[in-house]
From Swiss-Prot:
NCBIfam families: PRK05248.1-2
Similarity-based family: Belongs to the UPF0231 family.
Name this protein carries in UniProt: UPF0231 protein HI_1724
Native source organism of the sequence: Haemophilus influenzae (strain ATCC 51907 / DSM 11121 / KW20 / Rd)
Pfam families for this protein: UPF0231
InterPro entries, sorted: UPF0231 (IPR008249)
Length: 117
């Protein structure tokens, strides 16, 4: 997972690789100005054991965490799988849904903590 933190005019923001845009959006809209939320997500991810799942609900995005994977999903992403779309139409959810390994997520958050130190 590729990402880059930048500091501009007193704010830290992150850019992520295309398949992880939802993770960047989560960070930039939900937690960048709230270190408690970052530390909560980091400690939650670090404390997960096998077959354990945690959910962290935010205003715009929700995190679904287990020992192997983290899913970031926009709260407004409500797709009914039985809903029929016109031919050649597809849902665009690249900015609303992202998956990464739990260790990658921990590395991402720890990199932020190191970046602001």
């Amino acid at each position: 997972m590729d990402f880059q933190f930048t500091h501009y005019q007193g704010n830290v923001s992150v850019k992520c690789s295309m398949e992880h845009i939802a993770l960047a959006n989560w960070f930039n809209t939900e937690v960048r100005s709230n270190s408690d939320k970052i530390l909560t997500a980091l400690s939650t991810a670090k404390s997960l054991i096998e077959n354990q799942e945690k959910v962290l609900i935010g205003t715009e995005y929700t995190l679904f965490l287990n020992a192997d994977e983290v899913m970031v999903r926009a709260n407004n992403l409500a797709i009914e799988s039985d809903e029929i779309l016109e031919q050649d139409f597809h849902y665009y959810d690249e900015e609303s849904l992202a998956f990464c390994g739990t260790q990658d997520f921990i590395h991402f958050l720890q990199s932020y903590v190191d970046f602001i130190a």
